Swiss-Prot record:
Sequence motif 'KMSKS' region, location on chain: 231-235
Species: Neisseria meningitidis serogroup C / serotype 2a (strain ATCC 700532 / DSM 15464 / FAM18)
Protein name: Tyrosine--tRNA ligase
Family: Belongs to the class-I aminoacyl-tRNA synthetase family. TyrS type 1 subfamily.
Functional description taken from the UniProt entry: Catalyzes the attachment of tyrosine to tRNA(Tyr) in a two-step reaction: tyrosine is first activated by ATP to form Tyr-AMP and then transferred to the acceptor end of tRNA(Tyr).
GO cellular component, one term: cytosol
Subunit structure: Homodimer.
One BP term from GO: tyrosyl-tRNA aminoacylation
InterPro entries reported in the protein's UniProt record: aa-tRNA-synth_I_CS, aa-tRNA-synth_Ic, Rossmann-like_a/b/a_fold, S4_RNA-bd_sf, SYY-like_C, Tyr-tRNA-ligase, Tyr-tRNA-ligase_bac-type, Tyr-tRNA-ligase_bac_1
Residues bound to ATP: K234
EC number: 6.1.1.1
Motif ('HIGH' region): 39-48
């Protein structure tokens, strides 16, 4: 199966230019292709995964991927289908983000061997270009009429009170020139990107043909949608980042574990490197079993292993199992740090707090009276163990102090998992 056929079977092609010619070229020879990543934050998020993984798929088929980090274009920001003007970031901020994104792209691609991946930064050519050269050598090849007819530009112009600045209007010229420059430097003949990049990609194709009389191609990947209409890649806590310091491996694992049945088989095709035959077999087995599908677990394992590695996957599974177990002794200090980052609602507490106060503070009970009822009915656990009276000498006027949280409840001298019922948790972080 060719790489184009594989992408088609996974539903990963939204638009292409001359797909028959592209497929023939890919079957006849090994090519160089690229995808651009503008630094708009200090980390990539799962919305970037499709193009990153597409580069990897092409490399596995023997082609040379180029990861282009937009050190220059990131100073402006892509206006494509954005409702309003982007805020501009300082050169120092963008430079820091460039380095972060470069390091995050590295694990996905192999930078050794015959088709070693290439890392590029468009600041290398735009940083040396002056305004007159840009207007004379690049601008003359672009039609303002054609630019105004791009759907992404028309939407901004037609939106009341919006409009578009010349800075953002000129963005497609910069991205278009990236293609021409990478064609000249590295022989790139294919640009891939998200479906919102079609206008920018075709601008680069046109410019490269005009400058170098080369046939080059574009391919876009689909917008990832969820069956319930909500935005993919967002949780109540915000974006799901690839950086473990922004989204913990545990939370990352949980995100994939919670994918709806209606989406999970599509996402297995989109995001994993399991074969279509393997995915179809998983779906058939799930539908025949009549019990809880295995697909979500497989998806969560594949994605967490791919992004964070085997150790992080093991930690995510350990945390997931321990939260609902009586024995939580297997949790490491690093596991608790993940929970404190984003795994559980975390609350700072001080010595002397009792379990009733802790339940109210964390919102696991709405009042002291309700909290006492939970404690008396044995519905409250501390690190997996039932909360029990441990302070027989408490003051008569403070009956709730019969169960004080103390050193025996502190894991690593800092953490206590408070649980009410089967699924309601909070993490106490001791000052």
């Amino acid at each position: 199966m060719s790489v184009i056929q594989d992408l088609q079977s996974r539903g990963l092609i939204a638009q292409t230019t001359d797909i028959e010619a592209l497929d023939a070229l890919l079957n006849e020879q090994k090519i160089s292709l690229y995808c651009g990543f503008d630094p708009t934050a200090d980390s990539l998020h799962i919305g970037h995964l499709l193009p990153v993984l597409a580069l990897r798929r092409f490399q596995q088929a023997g082609h040379t991927p180029i990861a282009l980090v937009g050190g220059a274009t990131g100073m402006i920001g892509d206006p494509s289908f954005k409702a309003a003007e982007r805020s501009l970031n300082s050169a120092e901020t963008v430079a820091g983000w460039v380095e972060s994104i470069r390091s995050q792209l590295t694990p996905f691609l192999s930078f050794e061997g015959g088709n070693a991946a290439i890392m590029a930064n468009n600041a290398d050519w735009f940083g040396k270009m002056n305004c007159l050269d840009f207007l004379r050598d690049i601008g003359k090849h672009f039609s303002v009429n054609a630019m105004l007819n791009k759907e992404s530009v028309k939407q901004r112009i037609d939106r009341d009170g919006a409009g578009i600045s010349f800075t953002e209007f000129a963005y497609s010229l910069l991205q278009g020139y990236d293609f021409a420059e990478l064609n000249k430097r590295h022989g790139a003949v294919l640009e891939i990107g998200g479906s919102d990049q079609w206008g920018n990609i075709t601008a680069g194709i046109d410019l490269t043909r005009r400058l170098y009389q080369k046939q080059v191609f574009g391919l876009t990947l689909p917008l990832v949608t969820k069956s319930d209409g909500t935005k993919f890649g967002k949780t109540e806590g915000g974006a799901v980042w690839l950086n473990a310091k922004k989204t913990s491996p545990y939370q990352f694992y949980q995100f994939w574990l919670k994918v709806a049945d209606a989406d999970v088989y599509k996402f297995l095709k989109y995001f994993t490197f399991l074969s279509i035959e393997e995915i179809d077999a998983i779906e058939a087995k799930d539908k025949a079993s009549g019990s809880k599908p295995e697909a979500q677990r497989i998806l969560a394992e594949e994605m967490t292993r791919l992004i964070h590695g085997e150790e992080a996957l093991a930690a995510a599974q350990r945390i997931s199992e321990s939260l609902f177990a009586e024995d939580q002794s297997s949790l490491t200090e690093s596991d608790f740090e993940q929970l404190a980052l984003d795994g559980l609602p975390a609350f700072e507490v001080s010595d002397g707090i009792n379990v009733v106060e802790a339940l109210v503070k964390t919102g696991l009970a709405s009042s002291n009276k309700e909290a006492r009822g939970f404690v008396n009915s044995k519905a409250v656990l501390l690190n997996g163990k039932p909360a029990e009276a441990n302070n027989p000498n408490h003051a008569a006027e403070r009956p709730d102090d019969a169960c004080l949280l103390n050193g025996e409840h502190k894991r690593f001298g800092k953490y206590t998992i408070l649980r009410r019922g089967k699924r309601n948790h909070a993490l106490l972080v001791w000052k």
